């Protein structure tokens, strides 16, 4: 009888160990995919359960939160990421996961409309990141802090953090994020009424986007340059640039109509500008 009980216990331990190894292996696989193939990472995580040790459950919760964010699924319930924090807050040596947990918790709070709560978490991460060499994650953090200040119309603080984001992305050699941060800097500068500086920054973003063939970011740069030339009214827009802006504007989207309003104003075609302005306000067309 005793032998049977012992054998049963050994079998349970064996199969539990196999399950745990399988769970860890799948979590490793999801983590490896999460940057470049977040949809695949999310599929793996959806097939797993939040089981195992406290460390495995916390890792699962953090990875799942990250995968949702990277797949543009806008979660507003923080119960999952709180579960990760309940574990990682007691493990200061795992600073990287501590920072990531607070970062994604901040994003959930921001989506739920709790901007002060999000900012408190972001500033806590900023303090912790001083002890690490993680320029990419620092860049993501500074971009989010900049967004909070931008939404509060504190454009000088927003510009400061967008610039920090750009510098960190540059250090991380991530040119796509560097281009986005440069566009954010330009937007903050534009809203601070420094048109000359905004023009330089939008032009710099366009150069980066052209160099690395980031078509959507190039289009965003062109659209904003058109608006900037219209608003400033000081400089004559180069003909080649104006032609390129016009060619980049789709004629079936709201952003495209907005760009074509600016293009026709710059060409002094008032009737055409009015035509696209009417389309802009009456069309059900989607955004770009």
Spell out what each predicted region is:
Residues 18-66, 70, 74-78, 96-97:
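N-terminal leader/linker segments that initiate helical-solenoid repeat arrays
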Residues 44-45, 76-84, 235-245, 273-279:
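Alpha-helical repeat scaffolds
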Residues 46-50, 84-90, 124-128, 163-168, ...:
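Amphipathic alpha-helical segments of tetratricopeptide repeats
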Residues 62, 69, 100-111, 136-151, ...:
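Conserved alpha-helical positions within TPR/SEL1-like repeat arrays
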Residues 281-288:
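Conserved small/polar residues in nucleotide/adenosyl-binding loops
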């Amino acid at each position: 009888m005793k032998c049977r009980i012992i054998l049963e216990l050994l079998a349970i331990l064996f199969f539990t160990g196999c399950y745990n190894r399988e769970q860890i292996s799948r979590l490793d696989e999801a983590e490896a995919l999460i940057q470049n193939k977040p949809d695949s990472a999310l599929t793996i995580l959806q097939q797993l359960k939040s089981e195992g040790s406290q460390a495995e459950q916390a890792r699962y919760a953090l990875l799942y939160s990250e995968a949702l964010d990277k797949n543009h699924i806008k979660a507003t319930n923080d119960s999952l990421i709180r579960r990760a924090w309940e574990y990682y807050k007691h493990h200061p040596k795992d600073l990287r996961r501590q920072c990531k947990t607070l970062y994604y918790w901040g994003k959930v709070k921001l989506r739920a409309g709790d901007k002060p709560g999000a900012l408190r978490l972001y500033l806590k991460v900023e303090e912790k990141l001083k002890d690490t060499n993680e320029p990419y994650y620092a860049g993501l953090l500074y971009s989010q802090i900049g967004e909070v200040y931008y939404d509060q119309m504190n454009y000088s603080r927003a510009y400061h953090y967008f610039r920090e984001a750009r510098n960190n992305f540059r250090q991380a050699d991530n040119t796509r994020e560097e281009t986005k941060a440069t566009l954010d800097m330009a937007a903050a500068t534009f809203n601070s009424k420094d048109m000359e500086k905004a023009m330089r920054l939008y032009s710099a973003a366009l150069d980066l986007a052209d160099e690395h063939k980031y078509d959507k970011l190039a289009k965003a740069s062109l659209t904003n340059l058109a608006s900037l030339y219209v608003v400033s009214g000081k400089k004559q827009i180069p003909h080649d640039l104006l032609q390129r802006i016009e060619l980049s504007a789709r004629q079936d989207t709201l952003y495209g109509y907005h760009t074509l309003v600016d293009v026709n104003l710059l060409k002094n075609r008032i009737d055409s500008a009015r035509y696209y302005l009417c389309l802009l306000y009456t069309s059900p067309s989607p955004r770009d």
